[in-house]
């Protein structure tokens, strides 16, 4: 199976976690896009979705799925999204698509987080994939200097402005052994909106696309 076929398999497998008459949290990226396609097949069974990006919102609406503002819901039954890396503790690096802040808000709203990935995203230690940090523009240089102190090499993601109007620093060469501590530290730097480490609130279930089919991993 190609990588895209693996992504499609886990996207459709995630439908098993969607209950009727609920509002579904929907992520961003190529794997999440397959889940949105799958969601379109049961759109008359759900109330709608809360989306983590403008791109996902457009795709949901094109399929006729109602999109709700996060401020209009108290909680979500389930949130389905991909990841750039996931470790054995179900902690993740997310934000390659620059939607990390909205993704983190939706994960906080959700009772269950289903991470959908192909097997290439599974790692023992987080950090080989550059860690995205969303930063208020005026703080970019200051935050970059603080990230260097952590041992990372921050790189400004040129030409990218988030849906919130901010910029992204991608931090290379981090070997993240204590993901909770790193998440808390970076989130405490003035000017950081959020870091793309999902460690305090990790995934509850990972659906992993492999050559042998979709494997389910739980905490």
UniProtKB/Swiss-Prot annotation:
Q: What Pfam families does this protein's entry cite?
A: Rib_5-P_isom_A (PF06026)
- Active-site residues, record numbering mapped to chain: 103
State its Enzyme Commission number(s): 5.3.1.6
InterPro entries xrefs: NagB/RpiA_transferase-like, Ribose5P_isomerase_typA_subgr, Ribose5P_isomerase_type_A
Q: What are the alphabetically sorted keywords of the record?
A: Isomerase
One GO cellular-component annotation of the UniProt record comes to: cytosol
Gene3D superfamilies per record: 3.30.70.260, 3.40.50.1360
Q: What are the BP-aspect GO terms?
A: D-ribose metabolic process; pentose-phosphate shunt, non-oxidative branch
One Gene Ontology molecular-function label: ribose-5-phosphate isomerase activity
Binding positions (substrate): 28-31, 81-84, 94-97, 121
Outline what the protein does: Catalyzes the reversible conversion of ribose-5-phosphate to ribulose 5-phosphate.
Q: Which family does it belong to?
A: Belongs to the ribose 5-phosphate isomerase family.
Q: Assembly and partners?
A: Homodimer.
Name of this chain's protein: Ribose-5-phosphate isomerase A
């Amino acid at each position: 199976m190609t990588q895209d076929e693996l992504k499609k398999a886990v996207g459709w497998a995630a439908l098993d976690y969607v209950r009727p008459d609920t509002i579904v949290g929907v992520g961003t990226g190529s794997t999440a896009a397959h889940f949105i396609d799958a969601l379109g097949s049961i759109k008359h069974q759900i109330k709608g979705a809360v989306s983590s990006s403008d791109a996902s919102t457009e795709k949901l609406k094109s399929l006729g799925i109602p999109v709700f503002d996060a401020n209009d819901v108290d909680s979500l039954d389930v949130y389905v999204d991909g990841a750039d890396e996931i470790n054995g503790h179900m902690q993740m690096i997310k934000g390659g698509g620059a939607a990390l802040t909205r993704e983190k808000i939706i994960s906080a709203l959700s009772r269950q987080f289903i991470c959908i990935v192909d097997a290439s995203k599974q790692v023992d230690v987080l950090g080989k994939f550059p860690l995205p940090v969303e930063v208020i523009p005026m703080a970019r240089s200051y935050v970059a200097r603080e990230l260097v102190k952590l041992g990372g090499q921050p790189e400004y993601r040129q030409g990218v402005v988030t849906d919130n109007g901010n910029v992204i620093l991608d931090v290379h060469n981090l070997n993240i052994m204590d993901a909770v501590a790193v998440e808390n530290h970076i989130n405490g730097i003035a000017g950081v909106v959020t870091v793309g480490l999902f460690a305090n609130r990790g995934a509850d279930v990972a659906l992993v696309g492999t050559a042998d089919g979709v494997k389910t991993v739980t905490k």
